[in-house]
A protein has these predicted regions:
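Soluble N-terminal interaction domains of secretory/endomembrane membrane proteins
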Residues: 1-135
Length: 135
């Protein structure tokens, strides 16, 4: 059971853009890592774009399960995990992250924000905390 990506996005007009993301690509071959990370960023944006405000969904993409939660204020979170990772845990994590993000980052910064301009550093910690260590 593994988490690969945790992203916070903003679903505004006309498109979705990434505000902050964390990735764990350590299980991939060194030469594949950047393309895997690119795929996860693209997939996260696409899924958030296709989801309605106020909705939750789980979408299978290749060998991954992508869990998306788009709040009614346009803030969205996407977790990309393997097929065995519990769906309920993913949505609990998304709830927690989006709630904390909305408290720490001003709503005025969401429409124009980018990973370089948004200061929110908790994603890497959540990604490693929610990894399930297999014995």
């Amino acid at each position: 059971m593994r988490l690969y990506s945790l992203s916070v996005l903003y679903k505004g007009d006309p498109k979705v853009h990434l505000l902050k993301a964390a990735y764990d690509v350590s299980t991939f071959n060194f030469f594949q890592r950047s393309s895997v990370q690119e795929f996860m960023t693209f997939t996260s944006q696409l899924i958030a774009e296709r989801s309605a405000l106020g909705s939750r969904a789980s979408v299978k993409e290749q060998e991954y399960l992508c869990h998306v939660y788009v709040r009614s204020d346009g803030l969205a979170g996407v977790v990309i995990a393997d097929n065995e990772y519990p769906q309920r845990v993913c949505f609990t994590l998304l709830d927690k992250v989006l709630e904390e993000f909305s408290r720490q980052v001003s709503k005025m910064d969401w429409p124009s924000g980018s990973p370089a301009t948004i200061s929110y550093s908790a994603l890497d910690g959540y990604l490693s905390k929610y990894q399930v260590q297999t014995p």
